[in-house]
Amino acid sequence: MKHSYFISDLHLSETQPELTALFVDFMQNLAPQAERLYILGDLFDFWIGDDEQSALIQQVKDLIKSVSNQGVQCYFQHGNRDFLIGERFAKDTGVQLLPDYQLITLYDKKILLCHGDTLCIDDEAYQQFRRRVHQKWLQRLFLCLPLKVRVIIAEKIRAKSNQDKQAKSQEIMDVNQAFTAEKVQEFDVNLLIHGHTHREAIHQQEEFTRIVLGDWRKNYASILKMDESGEFGFIKD
């Protein structure tokens, strides 16, 4: 039966090879069987520009390119850790870059896709930070810096983010229910798929269904499968 996959929040990095191993297994064994693959952000733990090169980056690029070359339509939506992924990465992998909110039709279902961080409006400090780093002039300036400098800046930002999370409540870091409902209504859909919060779940709400993709962990890959009958669910070992 025809089907597609949705994943997010893998946070791939050299420091967690077990996550890379899960991704390799998925891309070699499951992904080639799909019609479409949607990666909804935070594929990498951080991204400092398309000009960065490493064995991990090349391995990930090659895996995606291989799946794309086998006829799978691959899509990428930016996360809060890899929002600087650009056209060079897209060209190298064959993915199509998606905007912050993307409306798709899949197996006769209208679906709204987003990474999920834009729905967490109660986290005002993060939203201010997000608006700042998404300014195009600031991104261009950052990308002009030497790679070594960018790495230092990215590591400091990541450390500050991890520190800030310790002081924030779980409620603040989750989606705002009213705002999320407004977005669903704005795009006139009854199915929303997002990641970011690392709280894998399928929420059947009154007016719509909200599917939250989970983060990938040492022994678990959060993979949502949707088939042509319209059925969907997370793959369980």
From Swiss-Prot:
Q: How is the cofactor bound?
A: Binds 2 Mn(2+) ions per subunit in a binuclear metal center.
Q: Which residues bind Mn(2+) 2?
A: 42, 80, 115, 196
The alphabetical list of record keywords is: Cell inner membrane, Cell membrane, Hydrolase, Lipid A biosynthesis, Lipid biosynthesis, Lipid metabolism, Manganese, Membrane, Metal-binding
Task: Please provide the Gene Ontology terms (biological process) for this protein.
Answer: lipid A biosynthetic process
Pfam families reported for this sequence: Metallophos (PF00149)
Q: Which reaction does it catalyse?
A: UDP-2-N,3-O-bis[(3R)-3-hydroxytetradecanoyl]-alpha-D-glucosamine + H2O = 2-N,3-O-bis[(3R)-3-hydroxytetradecanoyl]-alpha-D-glucosaminyl 1-phosphate + UMP + 2 H(+)
In short, the EC number is 3.6.1.54
- What start-end ranges are recorded for coiled-coil regions in this protein? none
The answer to whether UniProt assigns keyword Nucleotidyltransferase to this entry is no
Which terms in the Gene Ontology molecular function aspect does this entry carry?
manganese ion binding; UDP-2,3-diacylglucosamine hydrolase activity
Query: Mind telling me which GO cellular component terms the entry cites?
Result: cytoplasm; extrinsic component of plasma membrane
Primary residence: membrane
Q: Which domain of life is it from?
A: Bacteria
Q: What does the function comment of this entry state? A: Hydrolyzes the pyrophosphate bond of UDP-2,3-diacylglucosamine to yield 2,3-diacylglucosamine 1-phosphate (lipid X) and UMP by catalyzing the attack of water at the alpha-P atom. Involved in the biosynthesis of lipid A, a phosphorylated glycolipid that anchors the lipopolysaccharide to the outer membrane of the cell.
Q: Identify its protein family.
A: Belongs to the LpxH family.
Q: What protein does this entry describe?
A: UDP-2,3-diacylglucosamine hydrolase
Native source organism of the sequence? Haemophilus influenzae (strain 86-028NP)
